[in-house]
């Protein structure tokens, strides 16, 4: 699966992931900034909302 991968300070690049899922991590509270994207599906918490997706490629835009 092709996923976008970056942190808050890096430019987004496309990564070919071994996992079948991508994630997009963002703040739950305003300002709702996107804090990173990448491979897999890490858990969220009270501050971070993690949206995971499995298809199509680049689904974590």
Swiss-Prot record:
GO molecular function: toxin activity
Tissue: Expressed by the venom gland.
Listed Pfam families: Toxin_cobra-type
Any one of the GO CC terms: extracellular region
InterPro entries: Snake_3FTx, Snake_toxin-like_sf, Snake_toxin_con_site, Toxin_cobra-type
Main localization (coarse): secreted
Highest taxon in the source lineage: Eukaryota
Entry keyword annotation includes rRNA-binding: no
This protein's UniProt keywords: Disulfide bond, Secreted, Toxin
Protein location: Secreted
Disulfide-bonded cysteines: 3-22, 17-39, 41-52, 53-59
Free-text function comment from the UniProt entry: Interferes with neuromuscular transmission by inhibiting the enzyme acetylcholinesterase (AChE) present at the neuromuscular junction. It selectively binds and inhibits with a 1:1 stoichiometry the mammalian and electric fish AChE at picomolar concentrations. It is highly specific for the peripheral site of AChE and blocks the entry of acetylcholine into the active site of the enzyme, thereby preventing its breakdown. It has been called fasciculin since after injection into mice it causes severe, generalized and long-lasting (5-7 hours) fasciculations.
Similarity comment text for this entry: Belongs to the three-finger toxin family. Short-chain subfamily. Acn-esterase inhibitor sub-subfamily.
Protein name per its UniProtKB record: Fasciculin-1
């Amino acid at each position: 699966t092709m996923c976008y991968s970056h942190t808050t300070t890096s430019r987004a690049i496309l990564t070919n992931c071994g996992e079948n899922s991508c994630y997009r991590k963002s703040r739950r509270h305003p300002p709702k900034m996107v804090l990173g994207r990448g491979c897999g599906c890490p858990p969220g918490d009270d501050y971070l909302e993690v949206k995971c997706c499995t298809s199509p490629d680049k689904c974590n835009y």
